[in-house]
C-alpha cells in the first residue's frame, strides 16, 4: 500500500515529499525528497500572503506552477524507489497555504495546488484540500497532524507531547487515556526566518547562531507575549496572517540591534512552547520535537533550560525523522480519505464531529 505525502509549510522554504508503505503491521518510510523553492517562487508566494492586485490570476498561475514542482518531487521519489507509478494508491498533497482564516462565520483556508493538474502530470490519484471539510464542520482546519501523531507515536503507558516547530509551532498531547488534544502555540520559525532574511539575506538562522550572538530584549518579549492569541484557550490555530514582520514592527523602538531582535524572536518561540506545556501539560515528562526548528540548537538548548526535568528528544527516537513527519502525515491523511476514514480530531480542531477530509482527483 504505497502512498506519497507532500508538504510545503508556512516557512516557504520548499517541498518535502515522502514515499511510504502502509501494507505491513507498522508504517514504513521508504524514500524522501526535498526540493527548495527558488527566490522568485518564494517571493511570489510571500506576495500572495498579503492583499494585493490581481490576486485570483496570480494565485491560479502559481497553483499551476507549484503543481509542476510537486510532480517533480513525485518523479524523484519514483526514481529513487524503482516503484511503478501504478503501484501508488494516492498522492496526498497539502499544497502551499496562502490564507488561513478559520473564523466562526465564513471561515476558509486556501492552499495552492491544482489537484487536477497534479493528477494529470503524475498519472496518479491525488488528494488535496484537507482543511476545508473540518472548517465546514465548525473546526479550525488545523492542526491536522495530531491525528497522525496519535496513530504513530502514542504509548499505552507514557503520556507524550509531540511539538512540531515549523513556520508555526503546534503541540500534540498523547495521554495514556487516548484523549488526544493539541493546538497551534504561535510562531515557530516564521518570524525568525523573516527577520533573518530581511537583515542578513539568509533564508534562515542556521542552528540559531545569529540569535545566540544577541541578547533577549525582555521588555520587547513581554510586549509580544501580551498579544491576545497567546492567552486564548484551545482549540486554536494561526498562520502568517497573524504573525509577520508587519505584526512585529509596531513593537520595535527602531534602535534595537538586529541580532538582539533575532534572539528575542527565538525566545518568543521558546516561551510560547514552554508556557503551553506548563499551563496545559505540567506533569508530562516526555517531549519529542519535529519540523525544521528541531534542528535549531540554540532553540532546543533554551527549551531544555526552560523545561528542566523533562526529557526532550527528536521524533527520530520514535521511528520517524523529524524532517519528514508532516509529509508522512499527509500520506496518511490521503489513505484516510481513500478509505473514507476520519482524518480530523474534533478535540483538536473544534469541529462538530469526525470527518473524512480531502478532495480526490482520480488517476
UniProtKB/Swiss-Prot annotation:
Listed EC numbers: 2.7.1.170
SUPFAM superfamilies: Actin-like ATPase domain
Gene3D superfamilies named in the record: 3.30.420.40
Keywords annotated in UniProt: ATP-binding, Carbohydrate metabolism, Kinase, Nucleotide-binding, Transferase
Chain positions recorded as ATP binding sites: 9-16
Gene Ontology MF terms in the entry: ATP binding; kinase activity; phosphotransferase activity, alcohol group as acceptor
Disulfide bonds: none
Pfam family, one: AnmK
InterPro entries per UniProt: Anhydro_N_Ac-Mur_kinase, ATPase_NBD
Domain of life: Bacteria
Metabolic or biological pathway: Amino-sugar metabolism; 1,6-anhydro-N-acetylmuramate degradation; Cell wall biogenesis; peptidoglycan recycling
Known catalytic reactions: 1,6-anhydro-N-acetyl-beta-muramate + ATP + H2O = N-acetyl-D-muramate 6-phosphate + ADP + H(+)
Example GO biological process: amino sugar metabolic process
UniProt similarity note: Belongs to the anhydro-N-acetylmuramic acid kinase family.
Biological role: Catalyzes the specific phosphorylation of 1,6-anhydro-N-acetylmuramic acid (anhMurNAc) with the simultaneous cleavage of the 1,6-anhydro ring, generating MurNAc-6-P. Is required for the utilization of anhMurNAc either imported from the medium or derived from its own cell wall murein, and thus plays a role in cell wall recycling.
PANTHER family: ANHYDRO-N-ACETYLMURAMIC ACID KINASE
Protein name: Anhydro-N-acetylmuramic acid kinase
